[in-house]
Curated annotation (Swiss-Prot):
The modification Phosphoserine is found at S208, S212, S216, S222, S245, S250, S265, S269, S273, S292, S321, S323, S419. The gene is Tle4. Coiled coil: none annotated. Keywords: Acetylation, Nucleus, Phosphoprotein, Repeat, Repressor, Transcription, Transcription regulation, Ubl conjugation, WD repeat, Wnt signaling pathway. It comes from Mus musculus (Mouse). This is Transducin-like enhancer protein 4. Transcriptional corepressor that binds to a number of transcription factors. Inhibits the transcriptional activation mediated by PAX5, and by CTNNB1 and TCF family members in Wnt signaling. The effects of full-length TLE family members may be modulated by association with dominant-negative AES. Essential for the transcriptional repressor activity of SIX3 during retina and lens development and for SIX3 transcriptional auto-repression. Involved in transcriptional repression of GNRHR and enhances MSX1-mediated transcriptional repression of CGA/alpha-GSU.
């Protein structure tokens, strides 16, 4: 068969031509050739992709180089602005000290010259920047505080703006050291020399690493670049740390200001140098409008049967208080509407202003040789750290209220990668501290906020010592670490010893919080006290931490046994007064003192649970109380405008201090000698207990609702209806730090180790701060 087939199809037959329908002929050599061709194609494609990747890596490196350049430029400019801010503050302080020694005629001339120096127009600024650009062009970039990119602007990669777009900033930065607007030539020359030395140190620290970095970058891959970038950022952080040690805490120096009326427009808070006793210039033109009188209503679920409306001239049966103070004005509804307790109003009294002082107290338009519309502001810390007085220059510079606060905050966030939490108060011209009419301001600078009052009533601004804000036991700032959502207005707070639990008193109950675990958002227990609709006004722990005493809008005090498996009321003390505003415990834990709404001070024997004595003297409600460390002397403040001291051994009144305003809070310094008093007129007064001298402090904008000394006695805090928490140096009142909350701060307490502060506020929460030393 095979032979037949071979005959039919002989091998010598020529093959037919290939037809498209026939299958492709495969051979080993052809397959190898095809594989080789495909391999060469893939190899070429791989080579093309590799070139593309290398090009992208090169562009990435270029982008990173520009990022570092812009970061250096921003950082250097920020440092320069801080330095100039400090120079201006010192020069202002010198003016304030020198001008009063001049004759009245010369004072007017100098004041006018200073005011003219502050008025810098945009046209002048543009001319200055143009001159700097020309000088920069002629000098080929020498002398700039930060390096320029090594590439011409025309050859930059896409999406990179030409360097000319930032040349104005660079020129401005290089110009900062050479200009001053204050006519004191010798001082100016001295500060300029110091400033030049500082600039040289900055350039050697930040510019040189950048130059070496760029020179070697050509032969590095992106991994090497990343490690170098991290190293450089570490060096920049070290530079920042050195400036922080000099008192310019730019990262911590702004306060988060959340206004109830306009939450989108917070304002920079005042901060103060140890060398400068001054107020924020943004609060100097007009007093808050007087508040019309309104009734003070008792907390009640049945207003028709229990509400007691009192006019301003009647005795107050339930002034709003906290752990040791009442809340005095009518910003909030009565407790019956599930909000802040009723408040006692007093019309505002605008202080007198003399022409010389008023001309100097207007906000400085441009207090430094650079314009404010760049929108560069210092930034608060990631964890809500509070300000210390080194360099909060938003308040110092008085950036125009027309400037977009959001844009300014976004600029800070973009430069430093932090949340934009800082803005400006659009109504800053409405703010005025309660400065006495005879001392409305100090010529040449920010008005003083701390005054020494001599025995004959003479007031003088206080020159702060060099160690006012430094040294052992003096905080640098504080940061918010926890928020305790109580659910009702928190009128009373106290901290346990050791620091583990916080007790917050609201409407009808005290809630216990474990702050040793910051993640805990719920109270560990709730102690129902008084009636459900009556506010707790004060709660005090005995030193052993096993017993809590609670008082408020009721005639009874509740004594809680906290050592029981479940906290329980072990006794109740009943008085004849309808309300208790504040409590104090003797150091030996044997006696409790309660401030009654009828003005009496009740003395309770805690062991026998009986009333043993009443101190009578206040003609209106007793609002606040404190006891000396040795337990021999008691201090009380009242709505009758008096502060009284009592001898506990003899049971009699020792002293009486009369004021022109109601007393809402007080604290006795643990180390003795000084008594701090917070008043309705927004003042804090620090009295010497044996001498007639005292200090008067003016940073609060409304009534001072609570006050507490640190246990070391070196500082104290006060809170107010202006939403502020202020920390002061004992006794002269240098401002250590300031926090602004979102509502009236009704109460406060400090832990025994002075490491934590707790505040209670009208927005139904308590806030825990960690004190940073």
């Amino acid at each position: 068969m095979i032979r037949d087939l071979s005959k039919m199809y002989p091998q010598t037959r020529h093959p037919a031509p290939h037809q498209p329908a026939q299958p492709f002929k495969f051979t080993i050599s052809e397959s190898c050739d095809r594989i080789k061709e495909e391999f060469q194609f893939l190899q070429a494609q791989y080579h093309s992709l590799k070139l593309e990747c290398e090009k992208l890596a090169s562009e990435k490196t270029e982008m990173q180089r520009h990022y570092v350049m812009y970061y250096e430029m921003s950082y250097g400019l920020n440092i320069e602005m801080h330095k100039q801010a400090e120079i201006v503050k010192r020069l202002n302080a010198i003016c304030a000290q020198v001008i009063p020694f001049l004759s009245q005629e010369h004072q007017q001339q100098v004041v006018q010259a200073v005011e003219r120096a502050k008025q810098v127009t945009m046209a002048e600024l543009n001319a200055i920047i143009g001159q700097q650009l020309q000088a920069q062009h002629l000098s080929h970039g020498h002398g700039l505080p930060v390096p320029l990119t090594p590439h011409p602007s025309g050859l930059q990669p896409p999406a990179i703006p030409p360097i000319g777009s930032s040349a104005g900033l660079l020129a401005l930065s290089s110009a900062l050291g050479g200009q001053s607007h204050l006519p004191i030539k010798d001082e100016k020359k001295h500060h300029d020399n110091d400033h030049q030395r500082d600039r040289d140190s900055i350039k050697s620290s930040s510019v040189s690493p950048s130059a070496s970095f760029r020179g070697s970058e050509k032969h590095r891959n992106s991994t090497d670049y990343s490690s170098e970038s991290k190293k450089q950022k570490t060096e920049e952080k070290e530079i920042a740390a050195r400036y922080d040690s000099d008192g310019e805490k730019s990262d911590d120096n702004l306060v988060v200001d959340v206004s109830n009326e306009d939450p989108s427009s917070p304002r920079g808070s005042p901060a103060h140098s140890p060398r400068e006793n001054g107020l924020d210039k943004t609060r100097l033109l007009k007093k808050d409008a007087p508040i019309s009188p309104a009734s003070v209503a008792s907390s009640s679920s049945t207003p028709s049967s229990k509400s007691k409306e009192l006019s301003l001239n009647e005795k107050s049966t339930t002034p709003v208080s906290k752990s040791n103070t009442p809340t005095p004005r009518t910003d909030a509804p009565t407790p019956g509407s599930n909000s802040t307790p009723g408040l006692r109003p007093v019309p505002g009294k605008p202080p007198g202003v003399d022409p010389l002082a008023s001309s100097l107290r207007t906000p400085m338009a441009v207090p430094c040789p650079y314009p404010t519309p760049f929108g560069i502001v210092p930034h608060a810390g990631m964890n809500g750290e509070l300000t210390s007085p080194g360099a909060a220059y938003a308040g110092l510079h008085n950036i125009s209220p027309q400037m977009s606060a959001a844009a300014a905050a976004a600029a800070a966030a973009a430069a430093y990668g932090r949340s934009p939490v800082v803005g400006f108060d659009p109504h800053h011209h409405m703010r005025v501290p309660a400065i006495p009419p005879n001392l409305t301001g100090i010529p040449g600078g920010k008005p003083a906020y701390s005054f020494h009052v001599s025995a004959d009533g003479q007031m003088q601004p206080v020159p702060f010592p060099p160690d006012a804000l430094i040294g052992p036991g003096i905080p640098r700032h504080a940061r918010q670490i926890n928020t305790l959502n109580h659910g009702e207005v928190v009128c009373a707070v106290t901290i346990s010893n050791p620091t583990r639990h916080v007790y917050t008193g609201g409407k009808g109950c005290v809630k216990v919080w474990d702050i040793s675990h910051p993640g805990n958002k719920s109270p560990v227990s709730q102690l129902d006290c008084l009636n459900r609709d009556n506010y707790i006004r004060s709660c005090r722990l005995l030193p052993d931490g096993r017993t809590l005493i609670v008082g408020g809008e009721a005639s009874t005090l509740s004594i809680w046994d906290l050592a029981a498996p479940t906290p329980r009321i072990k006794a109740e003390l009943t008085s004849s007064a309808p309300a208790c505003y504040a409590l104090a415990i003797s150091p030996d834990s044997k006696v409790c003192f309660s401030c009654c709404s009828d003005g009496n001070i009740a003395v309770w024997d805690l062991h026998n649970q009986t009333l043993v004595r009443q101190f009578q003297g206040h003609t209106d409600g007793a609002s606040c109380i404190d006891i000396s460390n040795d337990g021999t002397k008691l201090w009380t403040g009242g709505l009758d405008n008096t502060v009284r001291s009592w001898d506990l051994r003899e049971g009699r009144q020792l002293q009486q201090h009369d004021f022109t305003s109601q007393i809402f809070s007080l604290g006795y310094c643990p180390t003795g000698e000084w008594l701090a008093v917070g008043m309705e007129n927004s003042n804090v007064e620090v009295l010497h207990v044996t001498k007639p001298d005292k200090y008067q402090l003016h940073l609060h904008e409304s009534c001072v609702l609570s006050l507490k000394f640190a246990h070391c006695g070196k500082w104290f805090v006060s809170t107010g209806k202006d939403n502020l928490l202020n920390a002061w140096r004992t006794p002269y009142g240098a401002s250590i730090f300031q926090s602004k909350e979102s509502s009236s701060v009704l109460s406060c307490d400090i832990s025994v180790d002075d490491k934590y502060i707790v505040t209670g506020s009208g927005d139904k929460k308590a806030t825990v701060y960690e004190v940073i030393y």
